[in-house]
Amino acid sequence: MHKFNFPILSIINSKLIVFTDGFGDFVEKLPMYLKYLIVSFLVICFLLPGIKSIPPLDRDEARFSQASKQMLEDQNYVVIKFQDELRAKKPIGIYWVQSLSAYIFGKESITSYRIPNVIAFIILTLVFSAFVYNIAYRYFDVAFSSAINYSLLTSILLSIIFGFAIEIKQAKTDSILLMLCTIQQLIFWKIYNYGKESWNIYKHNDHAWLVRLFWFILALGILIKGPISPLLFFLTFISVVLLDRFVEKEWNLSWVRLFLWHQGLLIIFVITIPWVYLAWKATDGSLILNAIKGDFINKIKSGQENHWGPFGTYILLLFLTLWPIVLFVPY
């Protein structure tokens, strides 16, 4: 696996030279766990303001939190209801997480239902930091200490993005889903690289836990937001195969075997099917069918939640949603 030497990395390095020279010398002397504790503390400082005082920002947040509160009050952790109606919006996972948080921190305050988002985002920044470190150190001509500095810096920058600052203050699925998808992608990347290094999972069973963890995270993603996690995996898988074939000019699919497909499907089945079965039985199939027909299929057909716009809308919105990281785009 060859390394890449991209000019952009040198440019970014020159722009951050004051930071990396001063702060980097200090950081390098700290133990690794302390570095991540400092980053976590900074992330918390950036994210917590407003989590209690800001009222529900949209209709979905109020309905998610109310449904989770009802689940806790009714002690019914199978059927999702909003007032007297079945709520066929998203699988059960987010309601379990919010109900647990409300049980611990109190069910009356909207803050209790937002806390899982904050925790998920802290984990996300640490996982993303590990991702950046691995990529910078492995694929680019970056020294070990510089890779650590880049990874810590990206975690801090990630936590001050305007779009994320708004999103984590909403009791919805997106922050938790993003955390799970990031972990999923990091593990996928590691498995892929192990395959390229001719790592034989059948001879190194002590590392097979990583593959099982991948499927476990993917299954949790299904419980949080349905098909998004498997769709991300499928698109990533196809993209990597095509890149290997047409960019790397090789057709080596030995890494595909490392995913232990039979075990993976079993893990997904064991984690997701019990709730599907119980919910189907409790509602005579109404909850599951409404979720598939009324939510998932309608979104595909007509953009049920009106998340659409003219071509280029989301590119223009990046200047707002990804501020201030968008300042690095010219480089």
Map each language-model feature to its residues.
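Membrane-integral, polyisoprenol-dependent glycosyltransferases
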Residues: 2-331
